Regions:
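Short polar/acidic secondary-structure junctions
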Residues: 120, 177, 246, 629-631
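Short, solvent-exposed loop/edge segments of extracellular or virion-exposed proteins
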Residues: 86-88, 240-246, 602-607
Length: 701
């Protein structure tokens, strides 16, 4: 509907012409006097309208299931999976049964389904709509070209009824007579020689969607009991070795070794089967790049590890008694010849805080992402080796909005709470406040209650109203892709200092830090970058997060050409929700575009994210200290002082320990560091802010 809105009409006028029953809430214009510079008002109006569509009881009724799946890019053109005709098997969105068909990512398939009419029937002139999940790379259903990709057919099993294809929109019209309850229709996706192409991202329970418009009046609803299949990874092509960011001297260390396919999907290990519990054994060579020797770490040059075929290997050893940085390279042998990975730098130091890695923004198949919530957390913990993660499905964006379904919202929350493990793997409940008027924000709750305040509810459809609804809760909000597309942040509403101390400056969408960032967010708007907002007086610390839609939290960039993503580095006293909340409120964070370095910046006694008093003597100077442990040779270091930049050469080093005297910082200024590595890796420290002397004195008094 949005794509067909005439350019000559305003979104409201066009929407009302399509949906005469819809009215905007009274006072809407006064409620929203200023919008995001690229606000998608048509999307907001459509969400409001769809929430109030007057459906008939027969719309969305019926059920469907898969009867056969045939791989067309392998040898025999026979059904590779033939299921029993008759009753569909029990289905669960999170626990797909063994009998669910499984197909490889990006494969060509012919998928045969049966649709059974619901208890109220379908009138003559009623419509069926067929499509795979629209997110992200299934081939589209088309009804015109039998030789083309995605060609789909529908045939009635009963006399006197035919399914007339309507090419504009992949509808089938019921022609001849009405369909009675229980009558069946055979549907084939990929009916021609080209088949249909399966999504490139693996997921359990991928849905073949069927919508029923029982009266042909233009309103339809999705079947709740529809057909599903599992999409599985191809052979592994990349090994990923990840360890903790930081440990204390003498602490135990665990490195995880995972294998993924070319699109970042969790794959299965090759190797020698142990014959026990589906486990395989492999051999790995270990080398030190720099730092303590293998002998000092108690490691051998080659080690044999055993794990389940689809689980990570775990390499365990003990940190040395002295401080320093551990750098290891791990290489597969025999069946894993050609697989290798450098481990992220592991800093050994005695400190009241430690660095942890978090991805605080991502989506599952319950909105516009990939995979079940359960698989999302499995990937975050076992493949990406995150310390903390949040699943932030959209409040009202996707096929079944969670702000309309208490059951779906409860499922997401229950799964998040179930995976939580204090001191090891912290899950933070949340959702995305998906405002097409004022910009998207994800909302995180540092407790076990996570109410959804929807961006299309009149009471909470502005940022200030969202913050008032959250006031008093242990919660934070984060603006993201704030400088450009898909919708920029409306900075007219200044970030609430209590509830929004941080902002996401990098994700799969690009970088919203500044116009001179290495890869700015697409569709960037001049003056709407985060640095512009800081210059205007806002105080925001920096994080990155993936905004993953591919089911790969923590490694969202693996499937992108530039490997662009986002991660949050957080210095916390404890690995639990209260500790993380305190650290984020204090802005003790830094952002990366997916890499895992170690970064600490201070000016005089002020740490990243903190405020420091201005000195009355304008000739006074400050001592800047930067420590950085890189994941690739350092290309350059940018010292960013309000609107000015000083560029330092990186000289290809892996470590940086720099002290530098910088000129007097005036009240209202801020200072942060941006470090660029070979291969495109970028890290940003949170700014340090300069207070007027009087402000600091008043606070002290």
């Amino acid at each position: 509907l949005a794509e067909s809105t005439p350019a000559s009409e305003s979104p409201a006028e066009s929407l009302l012409s399509y949906a005469p029953w819809f009215r905007l809430p009274e006072g809407w214009d006064e409620q929203h006097p200023v919008l995001s510079p690229n606000a998608k008002t048509e999307a907001h109006f459509l969400n409001l309208a769809e929430r109030n569509i007057p459906l008939s009881a027969a719309d969305g009724a019926g059920r469907a299931w898969i009867t056969a799946v045939t791989a067309l890019d392998s040898e025999p053109d026979e059904p590779s999976i033939r299921l029993e005709e008759g009753e569909p098997r029990e289905k669960s969105r999170d626990d797909a049964p063994v009998a669910t068909p499984a197909v490889q990512v990006s494969s060509l398939q012919r998928i045969e389904l049966v649709f059974e009419v619901g208890p109220l029937g379908i009138e003559e002139g009623g419509l069926l709509y067929v499509m795979p999940e629209p997110f992200w790379s299934w081939s589209e259903v088309q009804l015109e070209n039998p030789m083309g990709l995605g060609y789909t057919t529908a045939l009635s099993r009963v006399e006197g009824v035919r399914l007339e294809p309507i090419a504009d929109g992949a509808f089938f019209e019921i022609v001849g007579r009405a369909l009675d309850p229980g009558e069946r229709i055979d549907i084939v996706m990929g009916a021609g020689p080209s088949g249909t192409r399966v999504d490139e991202y693996a997921e359990r329970g991928s849905e073949i969607l069927i919508a029923v418009d029982a009266e042909g009046d233009g309103t339809r609803a999705w079947l709740e009991d529809s057909a599903r299949l599992d999409i599985v990874a191809r052979e592994g092509t990349q090994m990923i070795a990840l360890g903790p960011a930081e440990v204390a001297p003498g602490d135990p260390i665990e490195i995880t070794l995972a294998i993924v396919d070319e699109r970042g999907n969790r794959a299965r290990w090759p190797g020698d089967s142990t014959g026990v519990d589906n486990a395989v054994q492999n051999t790995f060579a270990i080398e030190t790049i720099d730092g303590p020797s293998l002998i000092a770490l108690g490691l051998d040059e080659a080690t044999h590890l055993v794990a389940a075929v689809d689980a990570p290997y775990r390499l365990r050893f003990t940190a040395p008694a002295s401080e320093g940085t551990i750098r290891l390279s791990i290489r597969g042998l025999h069946a894993l010849e050609g697989f290798d990975s450098d481990v992220n730098p592991i800093v050994v130091r005695q400190s009241a805080t430690r660095l942890i890695w978090a991805d605080l923004h991502g989506h599952s198949q319950l909105s516009d992402g990939t995979g079940t919530p359960e698989d999302y957390f499995h990937y975050a913990r076992d493949i990406a080796r995150l310390d903390a993660v949040a699943l932030t499905d959209h409040d009202h964006w996707g096929l079944r909005p969670i702000d309309q379904s208490a059951e779906i919202a409860a499922k997401i929350l229950e799964t998040s709470l179930r995976f939580h493990e204090r001191d090891r793997f912290v899950t933070i409940p949340g959702y995305e406040w998906t405002s097409w008027l004022h910009g998207h924000r994800h909302v995180l709750y540092f407790e076990e209650d996570a109410p959804i305040y929807s961006a299309i509810d009149f009471a909470t459809d502005r940022p200030d109203e969202l913050w008032e609804a959250l006031r008093g809760r242990p919660a934070l909000t984060f603006a993201h892709h704030s400088a450009g597309e898909p919708v920029a942040t409306n900075w007219f509403f200044q970030p609430d200092p209590e509830l929004e101390p941080l902002t996401e400056i990098t994700s799969i969408h690009g970088m919203s830090e500044a116009a001179d960032a290495p890869l700015p967010v697409y569709g960037a708007i001049e003056g709407n970058y985060v640095r512009d907002v800081l210059i205007r007086g806002a105080r925001l610390g920096f994080i990155g997060s993936g905004d993953s839609h591919n089911g790969h939290p923590g490694l969202a960039g693996l499937a992108t050409a530039a490997e662009q993503s986002g991660l949050a580095g957080i210095f916390t006293a404890t690995l639990d929700r209260p500790g993380l909340l305190d650290a984020m409120r204090a802005r003790h964070t830094f952002a990366t575009n997916g890499i895992r370095p170690w970064l600490s910046v201070s000016i005089d006694d002020a740490r990243m994210g903190e405020a420091m008093p201005s000195r009355e003597d304008e000739q006074a100077t400050h001592r800047l200290h930067i420590r950085y442990e890189a994941t690739a040779p350092i290309v350059g270091v940018d010292l960013i002082r309000t609107g000015r930049i000083a560029n330092l050469e990186g000289n290809g080093a892996l470590s940086l320990d720099l002290e530098r005297i910088i000129p007097h910082l005036a009240p209202g200024e801020f200072h942060y560091v941006r470090i660029i590595q070979e291969g495109g890796g970028v890290a940003w420290s949170s700014p340090i802010f300069i207070d007027p002397v009087s402000t600091m004195a008043t606070e002290a008094n």
